[in-house]
Amino acid sequence: ELRGQNKYASLLDTCQEASIFFYNKGIVDLSVRVNRGEMQTRQFEPNGRLQEMQVKGRIGSVRWTVNQADSALFYGLAMDGTEGVILDNFSLRGSSGLSLRTIPSEMLKEFNMQRPYDLIILQYGLNVAA
């Protein structure tokens, strides 16, 4: 279960949109429970593209359940607001960044269609710079 928090900064205890991103070659059946409420279930047929299931509202907690996933790759989750700066973190500690070259450009384009980026910052640790 993912939950907002308020230990480090204010206004992080809730979000307005929560999403899960995946690619599937077979049927995927997902359920989501927002704020410990009723379960919402949706089924996705394969379409050869990055897919997203999204819920909206005042979200303090969200629990995703994969009920069925035939040949599926799950890429990540997002909990976002509807205004301000949104930060995505792809943690690659100890990496020189060469692994980024192995991500197919078509997949990067599909992510950019789902989550349009205005700025990308690459950060590397001291162990790579040394």
Name each model-derived stretch.
Residues 1-33, 37-130:
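Conserved SGNH/GDSL esterase-like catalytic core that processes O-acyl groups on lipids
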